[in-house]
From Swiss-Prot:
The lineage of its organism: Eukaryota, Fungi, Dikarya, Ascomycota, Pezizomycotina. InterPro entries: ArgE/DapE_CS, Bact_exopeptidase_dim_dom, Peptidase_M20, Peptidase_M20_dimer, Peptidase_M20A. It comes from Aspergillus niger (strain ATCC MYA-4892 / CBS 513.88 / FGSC A1513). This is Probable carboxypeptidase An18g06210. The active site is at 174 (proton acceptor). Pfam families: M20_dimer, Peptidase_M20. Keywords: Glycoprotein, Hydrolase, Metal-binding, Protease, Secreted, Signal, Zinc. Gene3D superfamilies: 3.30.70.360, Zn peptidases. Zn(2+) 2 binds at residue 142.
Length: 416
């Protein structure tokens, strides 16, 4: 098997030339992408829209690519949302010649879905430095950069170490609740207990740093009910908005209130717990007293458990409303929630950081003692924006980073 990261299309020079030499002969950004199988693969998957719920097309492309590189590919069906693609699937793959046959020691995983809207692939040339060529479009960072870099890191590793026990897992639905990873995790055939792997490497945009952990998550609506009436005679009704506002004001400040005074906990590692009231829906018209109001809340937990946070929030709502039973938190509306996730950072040569965003890490059940790493190219600060973009240099560095994590895991296994 040729080395996928270093094998470039012929451009009239000897095959012994270095990748840097070959790329320097390309005259445009498009030529550079075309000349690199790795960058071309990244381009190809970004060009396929895969907004959560509609991942089948990109999944098919990735699966066929892996099969063409002598991987055994298992397509695990994942239930669809009410308006989603009923044929979507997770991809679990491993080298067909692997001695572990579906029980890899080392698992690399990321997700193939993206947030909306689809933004076409674009290139922004840098005549002075090929590494600074900017690649824009939805998924260029989150998380198709990780998908591409993980695949090519594995292919490169297998060329030098054909018996390395490696597996790849690419899931759907990460951006909207993690159903893809939970479906894989709950499958006792694909994810048996105890875990067959000793290392899991998760791919998300971390700016090429190893992540020591990320905050926990709790989502829920706060609901208020009232009585509709003509706005000229508001005393004939009961405003759900007026009832909801004191609760929202209190909940919105819980991350700033000391825990001893009824606030949400902080930690030295993750800082403050943060509260975001992301959406409010209420009423039907300005001249009607609103009979209902609902606010969607997301809390990023710096410490404690979801159950502990629920108790704090519920108490705050009761106190703010004087115990009004018409204002309440519907914690059953969203399943799960999770505590802060502590991760491994024991591989030298990386910057180490923490992040505030959520990942599929808590959705994958693993045995105690399994190493979990979170690493990937690009910045979360552009990942969901209309300016989502990544450089060629960041992509290429991520391949090296994933290979370094793989090699550390291989060497650790040899020592045990």
């Amino acid at each position: 098997m040729k080395s996928p990261i270093s094998l470039l299309a012929a451009v009239g020079v000897a095959s012994a030339a270095s990748p840097q030499t070959l790329l320097s002969l390309a005259s445009t950004a498009s030529d550079i992408i075309d000349a690199s199988p790795f960058l071309s693969f990244h381009r190809d998957i970004v060009q396929i829209p895969s907004i959560s719920g509609n991942e089948t097309a990109v999944g098919t492309f990735v699966a066929e690519f892996l099969e063409s590189h002598n991987f055994t590919v298992i397509k695990q069906p994942v239930p669809s949302s009410s308006n989603g693609d009923p044929n979507r699937f997770n991809i679990f793959a491993y080298p067909s010649t692997s001695p572990s046959q579906g029980r890899p020691d080392i698992l690399l995983t990321s997700h193939i879905d993206t947030v909306p809207p689809f933004i076409p692939y674009g290139l922004h040339d840098d005549a002075n430095n090929n590494s600074n060529i900017l690649i824009s479009g939805r998924g260029t960072v989150d998380a198709k950069a990780s998908v591409a870099a993980q695949i090519f890191a594995v292919l490169d590793t297998l060329e030098s170490n054909p018996t390395a026990s490696l597996g790849l897992l690419f899931v759907v639905d990460e951006e909207v609740g993690g159903l893809g990873m939970r479906t894989f995790s709950d499958n006792s055939t694909l994810n048996p207990s105890p875990s067959p792997y000793h290392t899991v490497i998760f791919g998300e945009p971390t700016e090429q740093a190893l992540v020591a952990g990320h905050k926990g998550m709790l989502e829920f609506p706060i609901i208020a009910t009232g009585q509709a009436a003509h706005s000229g005679y508001p005393w004939l009704g009961s405003s759900a908005i007026s009832a909801l506002l004191p609760a929202l004001s209190r909940v919105d400040r819980l991350g700033k209130i000391p825990e001893a005074e009824g606030g949400l906990p902080a930690s030295e590692k993750y800082g403050e717990t943060t509260v975001n009231i992301g959406r409010v829906d209420a009423g039907v018209a300005a001249n009607v007293v609103p009979s209902s109001a609902i606010a969607e809340v997301a809390i990023r937990l710096a410490a404690g458990t979801p159950d502990e946070a629920r108790e704090i929030v519920a108490r705050a709502v009761r106190n703010a409303t004087g115990g009004d039973e018409h204002v309440y938190c519907d914690f059953a509306a969203y399943a799960g929630g999770y505590a802060p996730q502590d991760l491994d950072t024991d591989v030298p040569g990386f910057e180490v950081t923490t992040v505030n965003y959520g990942t599929d890490v808590p959705n994958l059940k693993v045995s105690e003692g399994v190493k979990r790493y979170l690493y990937g190219p690009g910045s979360i600060h552009v990942a969901h924006g209309d300016n989502e973009a990544i450089t060629v240099g960041q992509l290429e560095e991520a391949v090296r980073g994933y290979k370094q994590l793989i090699e550390a895991a291989v060497q650790r296994a040899r020592r045990t």
